[in-house]
Amino acid sequence: MALTLLRGMRTPVVARRNAGLFFTTLQSPLLSRFTMRAESARAAAPKSIQLATKEAAEQKAQGFEAVIGIETHVQLSTVTKAFCSCPYSYGSQPNSTVCPTCMGHPGTLPVLNAKVVECAVRLGLALNCEIAMTSKFDRKQYFYPDLPKGYQISQFDIPIAKEGYLDLDLPVEFGGGHRRFGVTRVHMEEDAGKLLHSESGSYSQVDLNRAGVPLLEIVSEPDMRTGIEAAEYGAELQRLVRYLGVSNGNMQEGSLRCDVNVSVRPIGQSNFGTKVEIKNMNSFSAISRAIDYEISRQILLHKEGQADQIVQETRLWDESSQKTFTMRKKEGLADYRYFPEPDLPEVVLTSEYIDEIQNSMPELPEAKRRRFENMGLSMQDVLFLANDDNVARFFDSTLEHGADAKLAANWIMGDIAAYLKNEKLSIDEIKLTPLELSELIASIRNGTISGKIGKEILIELIAKGGTVKSVIEEKDLVQIADPAAIEAMVDQVLADNPKQLEQYRSGKTKLQGFFAGQVMKASKGKANPVLLNKILGEKLKANS
């Protein structure tokens, strides 16, 4: 078993069984080389290039521009792996969802999961790509302990989709505006296993549960110029795969992983600079900060006449120090010795198959944003509502029940969003229905209840469910709209507060708010606020 898991490995390995599961342990020589290389890189980092992330934008303004591209790996939410029938579930016991095929045993043959092809075509269409009617698989060969076959099944020269683009809208706080970033290609491949490192750093264990899990790699054009643009591109891609249902897109689980290529060049120069790949970024915020730091590092080397120190390499982002460090020299395509996968036939598609997928596509984030924008909503509202497909569906359903778009957006973005944040819930986990939100909005607009009472009812509906009508009747919350009743309460409040009334007459007109509050308190929040302010104003004017 150990020889199969790590065949071709020249460093001693130890295999052991624990609770019925195999663990393969990588002894210290190879691991030590990796660790020593990273530590030496940290120690050797020149003091002059250890810049704070916030300086990146200032450095960029000094005659240079960044050129940024992203390679994104999306783990597909299929029932089984790409080339075998093993299931995969994040967090499973190590080496519990493996078989001879995904473990790379000699003589085993891969069988393509048709769902992987469907997901690839679906994402390719969503990215406005040209879909290849015929594509093929290739072997990408390299050595690493978590790659038991010694190669990865991928696609090289004929990907399933190419030459597309992704549209997005930048948030106002990042400058706003529309952006379009090119997509070079989308291709299918399998994932590798995972190394589990010991706390002491003296050994690593190999978990092959992830080996063979289907991935789609999306390669962007080098169209981005800032860390913010790159982070927003990644966030939009995450949004897209979630809308499509092809992946959960969770970065924390490794379902969406972004490797960034960064280079800088003098403004006006057409040739690209030497690109550096950055890995180990587990959030979109980290992507932005890592890129900004790397831009600063490269620009400073240029300005100090040390541009030759920028080499094609892979660097790791270190969250604690907020810096990038050398991991390894970057391989070229020739190093992988690609050649066609002999055990898999070509993937041949038909126009009918592609049309069927196209016709089943949901409304995508870009189209949804444009539709919401046409309702007269601000871009801030649009971005919030379209960010999560569940929120967007809740909003749409509320409108279908007759609610005003702006009022519905305000409730969802305000009180409902605050509740979800505090309780750490998603909108599909609460008991409030779109119908009842629509009824709540209508009850406030027609004067049945006040806005203040509406907020109280909302919390009850979110937590316990029920209907607006039943809560109003049960708690006697119908708004008081009888002028005589409100006038009587105003008279009583003015009579009970002679000192404040005298101060009002002396010019402290802000006390009108105090009197209004006392009336609302007396009415238990049920007094019609418009009618209350009208009657109170008339009474105060008469008493002046």
Swiss-Prot record:
Q: Which UniProt keywords apply?
A: ATP-binding, Chloroplast, Ligase, Mitochondrion, Nucleotide-binding, Plastid, Protein biosynthesis
Q: Which InterPro entries match?
A: Asn/Gln-tRNA_amidoTrfase_suB/E, Asn/Gln-tRNA_Trfase_suB/E_cat, Asn/Gln_amidotransferase, Asn/Gln_tRNA_amidoTrase-B-like, GatB, GatB_C_1, GatB_Yqey_C_2, Gln-tRNA_amidoTrfase_suB_CS
Family assignment from sequence similarity: Belongs to the GatB/GatE family. GatB subfamily.
Concerning HAMAP family, the annotation shows: GatB
Name the enzyme group at the top EC level: ligase
Q: Name one GO molecular function term.
A: glutaminyl-tRNA synthase (glutamine-hydrolyzing) activity
What is the documented function of this protein?
Answer: Allows the formation of correctly charged Gln-tRNA(Gln) through the transamidation of misacylated Glu-tRNA(Gln) in chloroplasts and mitochondria. The reaction takes place in the presence of glutamine and ATP through an activated gamma-phospho-Glu-tRNA(Gln).
**Keyword Nucleotide-binding found:** yes
| One Gene Ontology cellular component annotation held by this UniProt entry | glutamyl-tRNA(Gln) amidotransferase complex
Where is it mostly found? mitochondrion
Q: Which SMART domains match?
A: GatB_Yqey
Reactions listed under catalytic activity: L-glutamyl-tRNA(Gln) + L-glutamine + ATP + H2O = L-glutaminyl-tRNA(Gln) + L-glutamate + ADP + phosphate + H(+)
This protein's name: Glutamyl-tRNA(Gln) amidotransferase subunit B, chloroplastic/mitochondrial
EC number(s) in its UniProt entry?
A: 6.3.5.-
Localization recorded for this chain is: Mitochondrion; Plastid, Chloroplast
State whether it acts alone or in a complex, and with which partners, per the record: Subunit of the heterotrimeric GatCAB amidotransferase (AdT) complex, composed of A, B and C subunits.
